[in-house]
């Protein structure tokens, strides 16, 4: 516990509940990226990149390799962390962090899962798609730009890129 003195004593905790997830932009080397059409999620419908939760005790990079295998049938190699997305969930105030990866080496046979159908789509056309999950287009620059490594949403509803 740290105390910060600013117009009186305020107590702040260094710990908070955090939900850790991952997402990966997999490139095929021909200008296409692997897209997932989430259709079975109760509130998140549309296109995004595959990914999921980091399980308790699991390291972050192995979690994205596992999630990609589970959701696409492909085994990715050497995924590179390209940034993060974070926000506080309004329901419970819990911090939600998404570790964003890019990979271009993979093996296996592409197959869809219960999470949704997966398919290759031209990266150059993705930003303009009307099928994207709400807010996904705001994350794309973190995957594609060397100058942006984080996107977060303030509790006032602002989107900030770093």
Which residue stretches match the model-derived regions?
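Conserved Nudix-box catalytic region and its N-terminal flanking loop in Nudix hydrolases
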Residues: 32-69, 158-162
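Active-site-adjacent beta-strand/loop module that shapes the phosphate/pyrophosphate-binding cleft
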Residues: 87-109, 125, 139-142, 147
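NUDIX/MutT-family hydrolases
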Residues: 111-142, 162
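A short coil-to-beta-strand element that immediately follows conserved catalytic motifs
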Residues: 75-83
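Conserved hydrophobic/aromatic beta-strand scaffold that supports enzyme active sites
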Residues: 25, 35, 98-102, 120
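Conserved N-terminal beta-strand and adjoining loop/helix that marks the start
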Residues: 6-33, 50-53
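Charged phosphate-binding loop/patch that engages nucleotide di/tri-phosphates or the phosphate backbone
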Residues: 142-162
């Amino acid at each position: 516990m740290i105390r910060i003195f600013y117009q009186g004593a305020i107590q702040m905790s260094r710990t908070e509940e955090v939900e850790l997830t991952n997402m990966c932009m997999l490139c095929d080397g021909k200008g296409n990226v692997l897209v997932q059409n989430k259709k079975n999620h109760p509130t998140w419908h549309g296109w995004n990149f595959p990914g999921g939760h980091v399980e308790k005790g699991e390291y972050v990079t192995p979690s994205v390799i596992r999630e990609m295998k589970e959701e696409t049938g492909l085994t990715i190699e050497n995924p590179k962390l390209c940034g993060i997305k974070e926000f506080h969930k309004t329901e419970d105030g819990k911090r939600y962090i998404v570790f964003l990866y890019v990979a271009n080496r993979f093996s296996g046979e592409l197959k869809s899962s219960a999470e949704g159908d997966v398919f290759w789509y031209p990266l150059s056309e993705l930003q303009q798609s009307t099928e994207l999950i709400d807010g996904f287009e705001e994350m794309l620059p973190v995957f594609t730009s060397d100058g942006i490594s984080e996107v977060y949403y303030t509790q006032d509803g602002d989107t900030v890129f770093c």
